[in-house]
From Swiss-Prot:
Residues 224-251 are annotated as: Disordered. InterPro entries: rRNA_ssu_MeTfrase_G, SAM-dependent_MTases_sf. It comes from Gloeobacter violaceus (strain ATCC 29082 / PCC 7421). Gene3D superfamilies: Vaccinia Virus protein VP39 (3.40.50.150). One of its GO terms (molecular function) is rRNA (guanine-N7-)-methyltransferase activity. Keywords: Cytoplasm, Methyltransferase, rRNA processing, S-adenosyl-L-methionine, Transferase. It comes from the Bacteria. Its EC number is 2.1.1.-. This is Ribosomal RNA small subunit methyltransferase G. One of its GO terms (cellular component) is cytosol. NCBIfam families: rsmG_gidB.
C-alpha cells in the first residue's frame, strides 16, 4: 500500500515538504534505532501505518483547530508529537519524556527536520504539571502507549486549559476502563466526550481514541508525586482486576 492511500483515509494530503519530512523522519528513526532501541516498528509500511497514520488519526476531530498549543506526554521516539508538528506547522508542539537519551534524539530530529514549531523537554509529567509555565497552559494533551487510561488522565489534565482536551491513544477499550476513567475525571476536572473507534488501513487493527474535555480546574494536588498515579490509580474499582488494555504498539 503506498503512503498516498494512507492519507486518503485521513481526508488530508501532505504537501511536498511535509512528504519529504516524513521520509526523513523514517530515515532518522531507523538510524537512531541502531543506538537507542527506539522502536520495534521498522518496516516501511508498518511505520507509515502505526507511527504516522495512527499519530495523526488520533487528532482527526481537531484538524481544523487554529494554532493550538499541544503537549505530547511520554513521547518516547517522538510519537505522536513529531508527525503532528510536521502535519500542522501552525501548531505549537511540546514533546516530553523522562528518558534523557530519547529527548536528545527528539531534539536532534527537530533540528534535522527544521521544525520551528516544536520543542522537547526532559522531565516527568508529575513534576512539570506543577510548574507555572506548564500548568493549564495547553489546548491539547496527547498520550500514546503510556499507562492505564485513568493514570493517563491524571498526567494529562493538569496541563490542559479550561475548555481544552486530552486525547488518549488506546488499543482495545473495555467497559471497566471507561468506568474507572470517568471516576478519575471527576477529581481532575474532566469529562469523557468521545470514544472514537477506528481501524488502521493496512493491518485492520482496531484503535480507540478517547477524548476528555477539561471542564473545571481540578484539585491542585494532581498529578500526585511520581509513582503514586500508577501504584494507586484514581478511580480504580476496589477488588476489580486491573485492566491490561492492549495499547498502541510502544514506540
Amino acid at each position: 500500500m503506498d503512503s498516498g492511500a494512507l492519507w486518503q483515509d485521513l481526508g488530508w494530503q501532505p504537501d511536498t515538504l511535509q512528504a519529504r519530512s516524513f521520509e526523513r523522519l523514517y530515515a532518522l528513526v531507523l538510524a537512531g534505532n541502531t543506538r537507542l532501541n527506539l522502536t520495534r516498528i521498522t518496516g516501511r509500511e508498518e511505520f507509515w501505518e502505526k507511527h504516522l497514520f495512527d499519530s495523526l488519526r488520533g487528532l482527526a476531530a481537531f484538524q481544523d483547530q487554529k494554532e493550538p498549543s499541544l503537549i505530547d506526554i511520554g513521547t518516547g521516539a517522538g510519537f505522536p508529537g513529531l508527525p503532528i508538528a510536521i502535519a500542522h506547522p501552525d501548531w505549537y508542539v511540546v514533546l516530553v519524556d523522562s528518558v534523557r537519551k530519547k529527548i536528545a534524539f527528539v531534539l536532534s530530529t527537530i533540528q534535522a527536520l527544521g521544525l520551528t514549531n516544536a520543542q522537547a523537554l526532559t522531565g516527568r509529567a508529575e513534576d512539570l504539571a506543577h510548574r507555572r509555565e506548564h500548568r493549564e497552559s495547553y489546548d491539547l494533551a496527547v498520550l500514546r502507549a503510556v499507562a492505564q487510561a485513568n493514570v493517563c488522565a491524571e498526567y494529562a489534565l493538569p496541563f490542559v486549559k479550561l475548555g481544552g482536551a486530552a486525547v488518549l491513544y488506546r488499543g482495545n477499550w473495555e467497559v471497566q476502563e471507561e468506568v474507572e476513567l470517568a471516576r478519575a475525571c471527576r477529581a481532575l476536572g474532566g469529562e469523557i466526550v468521545e470514544v472514537d473507534a477506528f481501524e488502521l488501513p493496512v493491518s485492520r487493527a482496531v484503535r480507540h481514541c478517547v477524548v476528555i474535555r477539561k471542564t473545571g480546574p481540578g484539585l491542585r494536588v494532581f498529578p500526585r508525586p511520581a509513582g503514586l498515579p500508577t501504584q494507586h490509580p484514581l478511580g480504580a474499582i476496589e477488588g476489580a482486576p486491573r485492566v491490561e488494555s492492549e495499547e498502541p504498539e510502544e514506540p
